[in-house]
């Protein structure tokens, strides 16, 4: 009896967990000739979550998003959308499932001969909904995206940001469970990008909408995502909470993608670093959480007086978590000093790397 109860409880927990997953990919593979576009992708997206998938051009992002909406067929693996595996479905069977998936693109794909409200209502017209119901839904969505006064306008009169808002409204027309965003802000200027990201975050909060973002811009992930997955050569090489990945990138590609938005060693110092011991060892120090607030260096100074000087760095806040990166110089007069400093910092959860020696510092 106890065994039966235990088994039933486990099954119930498993079903409950599955119901919270809008997307689950397991070992998904897709090849084009000899090229592995997707090479064993596994990830989940929970209901109401915003997941950012980031990678360089050619990493497999576009193939992944096409597999998610059934436009591309995976060679193997499972792709579950709300618990249903779509990999074996016929084109006819895919149609109702696609209505559960909205999509926005880099290019807005609006019909120039249709008004804004007609563009938004188009998916509902295809479904056969009555005109009055279509327009009612279109007006609700235009209110949501801040374009209620543009219902009768034509796309040619809209700015790029306004066109993308129409695209978002159209993607939400059929009340999808999942919104896919394929580089939706890459053609927009920085200010418009921020406004579109704020809109998506607001929609996520108001509707509980699950969003999967494909992008090559870390700023987009930083501004909106709950979690991030880094894709490279068709594989997920790193995944985690955005603040954690930003604070402590594990994969080389992640560090490279972060270069533009994390503090970097000034070029005039980086250019003269040497592997040979010089007058100062240059260390990078990455911190997250309470230690990132700066007290750690006061502790280091007290424990090891005159052991370092601060060269460069800064503190940021991501998902309400302080994240910091600093560069310090440690005198090489005592060969063991850099090791002592590194040991002190790593014992307090800092990520430390000796970058080289500044031989020109007096």
Curated annotation (Swiss-Prot):
Any one Gene Ontology cellular component term annotated for this protein: plasma membrane
PANTHER family: AMINO ACID IMPORT ATP-BINDING PROTEIN, METHIONINE IMPORT ATP-BINDING PROTEIN METN
Coiled-coil positions: none
Major localization listed first in the record, in broad terms: membrane
The encoding gene: metN
Cell location: Cell inner membrane
Recorded family membership: Belongs to the ABC transporter superfamily. Methionine importer (TC 3.A.1.24) family.
Reaction(s) the record says it catalyses: L-methionine(out) + ATP + H2O = L-methionine(in) + ADP + phosphate + H(+); D-methionine(out) + ATP + H2O = D-methionine(in) + ADP + phosphate + H(+)
Keywords assigned by UniProt, alphabetized: Amino-acid transport, ATP-binding, Cell inner membrane, Cell membrane, Membrane, Nucleotide-binding, Plasmid, Translocase, Transport
Domain ABC transporter: 23-258
A GO molecular-function descriptor: ATP binding
Pfam families on file: ABC_tran, NIL
Membrane-topology descriptor: Peripheral membrane protein
EC number, UniProt record: 7.4.2.11
Positions with a binding annotation for ATP: 55-62
Stored PROSITE patterns: ABC_TRANSPORTER_1, ABC_TRANSPORTER_2, METN
Protein name (Swiss-Prot/TrEMBL): Methionine import ATP-binding protein MetN
EC class name: translocase
Keyword ATP-binding: yes
Subunit structure: The complex is composed of two ATP-binding proteins (MetN), two transmembrane proteins (MetI) and a solute-binding protein (MetQ).
Function text: Part of the ABC transporter complex MetNIQ involved in methionine import. Responsible for energy coupling to the transport system.
InterPro entries: AAA+_ATPase (IPR003593), ABC_transporter-like_ATP-bd (IPR003439), ABC_transporter-like_CS (IPR017871), ACT-like_dom_sf (IPR045865), MetN_ABC (IPR041701), MetN_ABC_transporter-like (IPR050086), NIL_domain (IPR018449), P-loop_NTPase (IPR027417)
């Amino acid at each position: 009896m106890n065994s039966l109860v235990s088994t039933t409880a486990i099954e119930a927990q498993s079903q409950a967990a599955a119901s919270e997953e809008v997307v689950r990919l397991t070992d998904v593979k897709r090849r084009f000739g000899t090229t592995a576009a997707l090479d064993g992708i596994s990830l989940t997206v929970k209901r109401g979550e915003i997941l950012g998938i980031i990678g360089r051009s050619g990493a497999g992002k576009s193939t992944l998003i096409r597999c998610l909406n059934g436009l591309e067929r995976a060679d193997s693996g499972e792709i579950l959308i709300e618990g249903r595996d779509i990999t074996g479905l016929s084109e006819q069977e895919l149609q109702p499932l696609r209505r559960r998936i909205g999509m926005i693109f880099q290019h807005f794909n609006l019909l120039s001969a249709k008004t804004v409200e007609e563009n938004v209502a188009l998916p509902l017209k295809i479904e056969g909904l009555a005109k009055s119901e279509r327009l009612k839904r279109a007006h609700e969505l235009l209110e949501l995206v801040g374009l209620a006064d543009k219902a009768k306008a034509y796309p040619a009169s809209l700015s790029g940001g306004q066109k993308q808002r129409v695209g978002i409204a159209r993607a939400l027309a059929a009340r999808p469970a999942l919104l896919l965003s394929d580089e939706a802000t890459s053609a927009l200027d920085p200010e418009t990008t921020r406004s579109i990201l704020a809109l998506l975050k607001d929609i996520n909060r108001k509707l509980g909408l699950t969003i999967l973002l494909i992008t090559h811009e870390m700023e987009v992930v930083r501004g909106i995502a709950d979690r991030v997955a880094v894709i490279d050569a068709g594989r997920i090489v790193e995944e985690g909470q955005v603040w954690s990945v930003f604070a402590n990138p594990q994969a080389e590609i992640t560090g490279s993608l972060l270069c533009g938005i994390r503090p970097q060693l000034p070029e005039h110092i980086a250019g003269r670093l040497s592997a040979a011991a010089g007058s100062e060892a240059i260390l990078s120090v990455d911190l997250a959480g309470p230690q990132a607030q700066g007290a750690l260096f006061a502790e280091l100074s007290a424990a090891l007086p005159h052991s370092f000087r601060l060269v460069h760095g800064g503190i940021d806040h991501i998902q309400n978590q302080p994240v910091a990166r600093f560069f310090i110089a440690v005198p090489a007069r005592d060969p063991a000093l850099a090791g002592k400093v590194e040991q002190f910092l790593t014992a307090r959860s800092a990520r430390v790397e000796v970058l080289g020696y500044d031989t020109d510092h007096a």
